[in-house]
A protein has these predicted regions:
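Sec-dependent bacterial lipoprotein signal peptides
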Residues: 1-18
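Feature marking well-ordered beta-strand scaffolds used for ligand recognition
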Residues: 19-344
Length: 344
């Protein structure tokens, strides 16, 4: 009887272990091609072509050439009203090439607008949006304009369309970016992350209340709530893709919501990576990259998004988030900006 019980225990263990760990034959691998040693932690990036704009925490904003692997510029602060001000802690950055702008935010502060043109001068313009900005995304508009969506941790979803405004005071030309339209939609949740396709949809991660989806007729028009999904855990970031949305939910792993599910506004989201703490998700084709903080990254095969398959966990340092650059993977880490190749 004891022998039989031991055999049964072994069978159960093998079954459970096999469910948790991917089959060794199906595990992918990664190759670390380059590490760009940014000054300070590489917290966030915005990539345009082969140029990366890096949010480097207390080390400010840095501009890197990814192809050559060299730093082109670094800005620890900026001049405002005759004084030089150092950055406290840059958390987010985004580049608007058409308007020659760089947007940056420090933790829980407004979005700062800087001009950065062909002369490579980093010129402060003004601040926009909310004092409690957690995340933002911006889209260029014709006629020297842009439209921005913001996850405001106090007020909800904010949006606005801004235009360049020039005034002259004592023969001094002052250029600011002023709102021409905008507003906000309140939510019971605490917005943490935001994404938009720039065409008709905005998605916002709202902490303990899950994820919300908003639709708009044209870019710059008022978004209206389309659907809301209450997910386990704390929804921190959301990534919109062609097939739906991927949501990172901290200690409760990740979720996938198909476009059909979002449109219907009801049904069960697909949960995966339940045993992992997921801070951020990026996707490219059939690959999903989950950022795990101190545990590195986890790779998933999402060729069947209704059943994501694990393809391995890789200790590549402390990872904040990831982004695909052509067919390679960029990792924002405490050791700098890492460039990897995924061997699938």
């Amino acid at each position: 009887m004891i022998i039989i019980k031991n055999i049964i225990s072994v069978i159960i263990f093998i079954f459970l272990f096999g469910c948790i760990q991917p089959n060794e034959e199906s595990v992918w691998s990664v190759t670390e091609d380059t590490v760009l040693a940014t000054e300070g932690f590489c917290r966030n990036i915005s990539v345009r072509g082969d140029i990366a704009y890096v949010a480097a925490g207390q080390s400010g904003v840095q501009v890197w050439d990814l192809g050559q692997g060299i730093q082109l510029h670094g800005f620890l602060g900026y001049s405002q009203d005759g004084s030089y001000l150092e950055f406290d802690d840059i958390a987010l950055v985004q580049r608007d090439e058409d308007n020659e702008l760089i947007f940056v935010t420090e933790s829980n502060k407004k979005v700062k607008v800087f001009r950065f043109g062909v002369d490579n001068e980093f010129i402060y313009r003004n601040e926009i949006m909310s004092d409690r900005t957690k995340d933002f995304i911006s889209f260029h508009r014709e006629g020297n304009r842009f439209t921005m969506f913001v996850a405001d941790n106090d007020d909800g979803l904010k949006w606005g369309t801004y235009r360049s405004d020039t005034t002259t005071v004592f023969n001094l030309e002052i250029i600011n970016w002023m709102p021409s339209s905008g507003g906000e939609v309140t939510t019971d949740g605490k917005p943490l992350g935001i994404d938009s396709d720039g065409i008709s949809m905005v998605a916002m991660a709202v902490d303990q209340l899950g994820v919300e989806f908003y639709s708009f007729d044209t870019l710059g028009a008022e978004p209206t709530l389309r659907s809301r999904f209450d997910l386990d855990g704390n929804a921190e970031q959301v990534n919109l893709s062609d097939i739906g949305a991927f949501v990172s939910c901290d200690d409760f792993g990740a979720y996938f919501l198909s476009n059909k599910l979002i449109e219907m506004g009801q049904g069960a989201a697909v949960s995966f990576a339940e045993d992992l703490t997921v801070d951020h998700i990026s996707t490219h084709g059939d690959i999903a990259v989950l950022s795990l903080g101190p545990k590195g990254i986890a790779l998933y095969d999402i060729s069947d998004p209704s059943n994501p398959e694990p393809r391995g966990i890789f200790d590549v340092g402390y990872v904040y988030r990831s982004q695909f650059w052509n067919d390679r993977l960029l990792l924002c880490t405490r050791a700098g900006l890492k460039i990897l190749t995924i061997n699938s």
